[in-house]
């Protein structure tokens, strides 16, 4: 049994009491059942027009029904930005085009996202039956078409933008996404029991982020994400975010804050972010903070707690000097500036550090992007903390870090500029060498 299937079965057997749609809903008195021409056309006909019509006719106080077990071809992007109090009952299966050139032409013409959904009180509700409710994007040929030395071919679409308030996504399922999965932005959004499967049988699945989050009071729970980038990335101007009871893996880049500060004029404002009770399998990162040097802003009150890691290269990683091999930077940068970090906690970590085969398939630069500034890596590091200045990190706390390298040597640490004066409860002495937690 694969790790992905085992993880799914574990979560399926757990209680399904979370992620229930908000109870204070006005009546959804109208229904639109989306017709499909998929079966009659042997999978050739496009159902995009019918889907767009359903979203137009049932944009308010309605239920839009994709019937259970029915397949739909979505060969054109769907945009529905005037929704209000709508349930999208996704019990069918959606199929994106398999013609790479056709999709690239659509993206190059200006449509970068395949599903754009916007409005208050929007609920995406899939079925408990794992055989249905999928979006099939057929990303494997896209990944395999990526030339050597490149981090993804041009004109790849984002799968979904979901902008709402008092909203729910339950049983969202994405298989072989081309690249980015869901951009969540808004307030009071709950995601539960999602599955994202971006495991590859060939080339690396670049940029297959799970959920990119910007907003207030957003929760993601009881979900599985196997991908080739951040499982969750919390962006600027986010507050009160919870990521809990999830399993993430494959070549995941973990639970991330950022990246922040690429544009020095974009002030980062993030607070009250919690990652709790998460299992990370075979990832490049588990807990990560990433901001560019020269950035501005404040990130405050962030906690990673009760994190189990298995074969993870960088279990705890902080950098305020981030670089992206696939992105250029313009404008004037104040090299002494940094996005400030305050009140960060890493507690109750346990598991194994990937010493034998560290890294992942995303490296196309020399030195590798994730090794930049770290020339003497031993891949026994439990923690890497790179504060940009002696003032940019404040009130860092570590507690009960039980991480061990696969070679069964003592764990090590790389630490820069997390001064004792500003971080009296850091839990270890900030210097490079063997990780030796201080007694309380």
Curated annotation (Swiss-Prot):
GO molecular function: galacturan 1,4-alpha-galacturonidase activity; polygalacturonase activity
SUPFAM superfamilies assigned to the protein according to its UniProt record, in alphabetical order: Pectin lyase-like
Coiled coil: none
Subcellular location: Secreted
Gene3D superfamilies cross-referenced by the UniProt entry: Single-stranded right-handed beta-helix, Pectin lyase-like
GO cellular component: extracellular region
Pfam families, A to Z: Glyco_hydro_28
Domain of life: Eukaryota
Residues listed as glycosylation sites in the UniProt record: 82, 99, 269, 301, 311, 334, 417, 432
PbH1 repeat residue numbers: 215-236, 238-259, 265-288
Top-level EC class: hydrolase
Positions of disulphide bridges: 387-393
Catalytic activity, reaction form: [(1->4)-alpha-D-galacturonosyl](n) + H2O = alpha-D-galacturonate + [(1->4)-alpha-D-galacturonosyl](n-1)
Entry EC number(s): 3.2.1.67
Signal peptide: 1-19
Active site: 229 (proton donor), 253
InterPro entries in UniProt: Glyco_hydro_28, Pectin_lyas_fold, Pectin_lyase_fold/virulence
UniProt keyword terms in alphabetical order: Cell wall biogenesis/degradation, Disulfide bond, Glycoprotein, Glycosidase, Hydrolase, Repeat, Secreted, Signal
Single biological process term from Gene Ontology: cell wall organization
Functional description taken from the UniProt entry: Specific in hydrolyzing the terminal glycosidic bond of polygalacturonic acid and oligogalacturonates.
Sequence similarity: Belongs to the glycosyl hydrolase 28 family.
Name of this protein: Probable exopolygalacturonase C
Name of the encoding gene: pgxC
């Amino acid at each position: 049994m694969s790790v992905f299937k085992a993880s799914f079965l574990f979560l399926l057997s757990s209680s399904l009491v979370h992620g229930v749609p908000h109870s204070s809903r006005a009546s959804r008195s109208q229904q639109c059942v989306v017709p499909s021409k998929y079966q009659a056309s042997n999978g050739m006909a496009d159902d995009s027009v019918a889907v767009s019509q359903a979203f137009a006719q049932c944009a308010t106080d309605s239920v839009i029904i994709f019937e259970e077990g029915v397949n739909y071809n979505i060969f054109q992007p769907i945009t529905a930005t005037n929704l209000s109090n709508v349930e999208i009952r996704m019990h069918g299966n959606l199929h994106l085009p398999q013609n790479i050139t056709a999709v690239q032409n659509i993206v190059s013409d200006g449509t970068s996202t395949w599903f754009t959904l916007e409005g208050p009180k929007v609920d995406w509700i899939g079925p408990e039956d794992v055989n249905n409710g999928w979006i099939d994007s057929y990303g494997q040929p896209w990944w395999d078409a990526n030339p050597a030395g490149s981090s993804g071919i041009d004109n790849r679409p984002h799968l979904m933008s979901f902008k709402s308030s008092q909203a729910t996504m339950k049983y969202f399922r994405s298989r072989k996404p081309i690249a980015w999965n869901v951009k969540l932005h808004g307030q009071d959004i709950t995601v539960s029991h999602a599955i994202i499967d971006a495991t590859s049988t060939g080339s690396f699945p670049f940029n297959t982020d799970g959920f990119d989050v910007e907003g207030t009071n957003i929760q993601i729970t009881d979900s599985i994400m196997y991908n080739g980038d951040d499982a969750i990335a919390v962006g600027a101007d986010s507050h009160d975010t919870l990521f809990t009871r999830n399993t993430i893996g494959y070549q995941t880049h973990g639970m991330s804050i950022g990246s922040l500060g690429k544009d020095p004029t974009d002030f980062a404002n993030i607070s009250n972010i919690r990652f709790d009770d998460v299992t990370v399998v075979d990832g490049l990162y588990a807990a990560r903070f990433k901001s560019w040097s020269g950035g501005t802003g404040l990130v405050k009150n962030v906690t990673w707690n009760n994190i189990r890691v298995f074969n993870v290269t960088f279990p705890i990683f902080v950098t305020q000097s981030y670089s992206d091999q696939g992105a250029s930077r313009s404008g004037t940068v104040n090299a002494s500036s940094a996005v400030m970090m305050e009140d960060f906690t890493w507690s109750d970590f346990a598991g194994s550090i990937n010493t034998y085969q560290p890294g992942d398939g995303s490296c196309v630069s020399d030195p590798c992007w994730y090794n930049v500034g770290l020339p003497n890596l031993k891949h026994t590091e439990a923690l890497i903390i790179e504060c940009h200045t002696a003032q940019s990190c404040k009130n860092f706390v570590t507690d009960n870090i039980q991480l061990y390298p696969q070679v069964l040597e003592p764990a090590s640490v790389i630490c820069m500029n997390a001064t004792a004066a500003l971080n009296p409860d850091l839990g270890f002495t900030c210097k490079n060498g063997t990780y030796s937690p201080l007694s309380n």
